[in-house]
């Protein structure tokens, strides 16, 4: 009745008009809808099928088919039956048989009995409708009971990967509205708004979404327990403007800054529509914050309270830079990243670690009261000149809980200031609790000198966590029973077969559910699927070098990677004295990074800005050379200017040479030596700080010598189905057992050699 007072083109009922307990439920609800002054469109839900057949539902809703289209406002609306192939399909029908077959063929998937999918015929129908709308230059909005994307990882159509692939071909698709998942959800993907409307039965008041469609955007007006939101079709820079005290410096959390004019007016440009944080600073005034500003925005106002003795410090850096700033010894943090200033959802102290990072795009401003000291963290431009590029494939903006309100532009800014060239984020939550649009952000924030991808760890379960490089997204990710399928099978299906590369992350970290249980299994059954290992995730890992040397001496080619597991909610940003992986590539492209990791052309820093490169006759890590006599070995290091470093050249697990070098004014040092190599073997290089005994600051992956006599490790068939007793054995192993060479023999007893 309240909606009758609003100007609407039509109303859509997204399904489940009743609980399915009584055949009279739907007719009773239809009597209520009959009082609407607006046309009502109907979508069938799983509860509607409980007491009614498809034919009965078509009659009740006045439909010729449960798939149909209609036009309004020049937009083509396509209504889908997301339960086309499901337990609700007509008994004895071809579609019901397909439902039973699909369950048998996917025993490891969590296929809920109240979800479903489209038949191949229905997907062809959908493609034809989209094709026709595109020819007629019409935008399209799709409607279904069962969603494609929402905040829950399991409440969606079983064939969502196939449907999303179809939608990707048609840029005129603008939105997908659904019900089914009672808590609701909102997500943007490739410029398509996916909105799951909350179920009225779970709300304390009448709830709906009113959708306003414009030429450049879609606005959702929340009604009841639904909230407002907005999605622009095309992303471009927008402005934040308003007033502060004259001469104030206005800084955005993403690094943009401007000084207010004599009248106090300011205006600055940010990357795209979204939610940002602003800070105003002026001599003699306390810092003033606007922590959750939705851009674009006008008429913003700061309340700047007096604070005698506070002063503004303004300066410049040589492009993007990471600074360590103290005020009488206390860190000056970028937006106080251990507290509420950027808009945390909880009080300081929960999860937080103090961050000491301050980032600059080339110009910086902060306020202080005491003695200020500014230190610029090392930046080794010569590494880029040698085509070694710094990156990470296991980082988070925040963890899934979203306790800390990070956003994608802030993360890209921090990564660039910490001199990352490429970055894969394992989580991509926006600071509005809406998952970010991965493709839109990566297109907007990537460039020739910085590659950003928003993805996820997958698989991630009690068998271990797997990072991946080369997949811009994992929309094909499906809910699965991790006790019924191995990470090996999931990685092979969704990552390796797609041409991407996977790396088990922190395989020897002892946290609950964090340990990689399958490393030996991967090496035995598919060693090329495990080209590198994340060995230096945590400095307290038990003896990673001995484990690495053991695998190399068995004949495996194992490169090294290191990751940051960076996340704002724990005060860690990518370079916060955490790990990073360098790759050697001819140019900074995603395809080149994938090939570098596959070919073990990697080196790592584990903190404090150190790096080391190893080359033999000009061939870097990953190279395979013939053991044919004399060669020139070169070791290059990067560390803090003036610092003494210890370099180790390791041959087949034994230290061949150890040298102390003094870093020059740019932090560089190097040496060369002659070697005479006539055997199958490997060399790698380590960098240590004499003041930090026992800690590896950097490592270069091996260079290998191999001739025709070299015998690769035996490869074994992966057992299908995977034996339950073998799965149980792996899951019960301790970190120490997972690093013990004897595990190879225990596994081989269950495997068959590959012919």
Protein language model regions, located:
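A short C-terminal boundary segment appended to hydrolase-like catalytic domains
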Residues: 212-249, 262-264, 604-606, 619-628, ...
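Binuclear metal-dependent phosphoesterase catalytic core
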Residues: 70, 184-239, 567-612, 616
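Long luminal/extracellular ectodomains of secretory-pathway precursor proteins
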Residues: 232-392, 397-417, 423-449, 453, ...
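Catalytic cores of extracellular degradative/oxidative enzymes
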Residues: 37, 41-46, 55-62, 72, ...
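N-terminal active-site segment of His-dependent metallophosphoesterases
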Residues: 1-28, 390-396
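Extended active-site neighborhood of metal-dependent phosphoesterases/phosphodiesterases
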Residues: 23-136, 162-172, 186-222, 438-455
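C-terminal functional module detector
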Residues: 296-305, 309-314, 318-328, 335-383, ...
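Active-site-proximal segments of metal-dependent phosphoesterases and phosphodiesterases across multiple
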Residues: 105-123, 133-178, 508-542
């Amino acid at each position: 009745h309240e909606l009758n007072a609003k100007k609407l083109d039509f109303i859509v009922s997204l399904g489940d008009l009743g609980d399915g307990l009584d055949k009279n439920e739907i007719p009773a609800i239809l009597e209520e809808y009959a009082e609407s002054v607006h046309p009502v469109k109907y979508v069938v839900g799983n509860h509607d099928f409980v007491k009614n057949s498809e034919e009965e539902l078509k009659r009740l809703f006045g439909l010729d088919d449960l798939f149909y289209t209609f036009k309004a406002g020049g937009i083509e609306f396509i209504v889908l039956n997301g339960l086309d192939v499901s337990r609700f399909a007509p008994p004895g029908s071809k579609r019901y048989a397909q439902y039973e077959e699909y369950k048998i063929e996917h025993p490891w998937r969590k296929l809920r009995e109240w979800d479903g999918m489209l038949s191949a015929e229905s997907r062809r129908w959908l493609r034809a409708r989209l094709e026709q709308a595109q020819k007629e230059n019409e935008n399209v909005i799709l409607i279904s009971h069962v969603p494609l994307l929402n905040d829950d990882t399991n409440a969606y159509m079983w064939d969502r990967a196939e449907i999303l692939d179809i939608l990707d071909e048609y840029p005129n698709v603008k939105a997908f509205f659904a019900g089914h998942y009672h808590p609701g959800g909102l997500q943007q993907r490739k410029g398509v708004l996916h909105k799951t409307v909350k179920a009225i039965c779970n709300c304390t008041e009448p709830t709906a979404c009113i959708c306003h469609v414009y030429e450049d955007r879609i606005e959702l007006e929340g009604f009841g327990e639904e909230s407002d939101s907005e999605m622009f079709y095309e992303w471009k820079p927008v402005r934040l403007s308003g007033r502060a005290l004259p001469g104030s410096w206005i800084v955005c959390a993403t690094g943009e800054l401007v000084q207010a004019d004599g009248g106090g007016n300011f205006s600055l440009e940010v990357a795209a529509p979204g939610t940002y944080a602003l800070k105003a600073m002026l001599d003699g005034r306390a810092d003033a914050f606007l922590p959750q500003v939705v851009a674009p925005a006008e008429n913003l106002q700061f309340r700047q309270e007096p604070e005698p003795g506070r002063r503004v410090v303004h300066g410049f850096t040589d492009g993007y830079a990471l600074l360590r700033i103290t005020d009488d010894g206390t860190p000056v943090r970028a937006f106080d990243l251990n507290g509420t200033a950027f808009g945390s959802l909880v009080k300081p102290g929960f999860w937080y670690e103090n961050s000491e990072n301050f980032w600059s795009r080339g110009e910086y401003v902060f306020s202080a009261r005491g003695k200020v000291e500014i230190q610029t963290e090392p930046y080794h431009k010569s590494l880029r000149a040698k085509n070694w590029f710094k990156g990470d494939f296991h980082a988070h903006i925040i963890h899934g809980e979203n306790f800390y309100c990070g956003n994608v532009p802030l993360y890209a800014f921090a990564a660039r200031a910490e001199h990352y060239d490429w970055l894969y984020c394992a989580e991509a939550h926006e600071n509005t609790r809406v998952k970010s649009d991965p493709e839109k952000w990566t297109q907007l924030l990537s460039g020739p000198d910085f590659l950003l991808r928003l993805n996820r760890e997958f698989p991630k379960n009690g068998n271990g966590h797997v990072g991946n490089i080369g997949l811009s997204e994992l929309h094909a990710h499906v809910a699965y029973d991790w006790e019924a399928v191995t990470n090996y099978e999931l990685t092979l299906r969704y990552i390796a077969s797609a041409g991407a590369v996977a790396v088990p992350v922190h395989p020897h970290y002892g946290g609950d559910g964090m340990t990689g249980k399958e490393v030996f299994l991967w090496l035995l059954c598919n060693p090329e699927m495990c080209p590198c290992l994340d060995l230096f995730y945590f400095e307290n890992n038990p003896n990673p070098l001995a484990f690495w040397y053991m695998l190399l001496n068995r004949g495996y080619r194992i490169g090294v990677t290191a990751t940051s597991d960076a996340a704002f909610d724990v005060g860690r940003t990518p370079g916060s004295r955490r790990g990073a992986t360098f790759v050697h590539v001819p140019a900074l492209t995603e395809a080149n990074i994938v090939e570098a990791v596959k070919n073990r052309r990697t080196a790592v820093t584990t903190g404090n800005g150190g790096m080391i490169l190893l080359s033999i006759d000009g061939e870097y890590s990953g190279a395979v050379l013939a053991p044919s006599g004399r060669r020139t070995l070169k070791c290059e290091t990067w560390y803090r200017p003036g610092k003494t470093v210890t370099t180790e050249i390791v041959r087949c697990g034994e230290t061949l040479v150890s040298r102390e070098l003094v870093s020059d004014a740019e932090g560089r040092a190097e040496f060369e030596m002659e070697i005479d190599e006539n055997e199958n073997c490997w060399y790698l290089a380590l960098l240590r700080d004499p003041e930090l005994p026992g800690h590896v600051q950097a490592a270069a992956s091996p260079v290998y010598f191999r001739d025709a006599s070299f015998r690769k490790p035996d490869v074994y068939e992966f057992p299908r189905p995977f034996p339950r007793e073998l799965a149980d054995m792996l899951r019960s192993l301790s970190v120490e057992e997972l690093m013990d060479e004897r595990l190879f023999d225990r596994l081989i007893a269950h495997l068959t050699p590959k012919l």
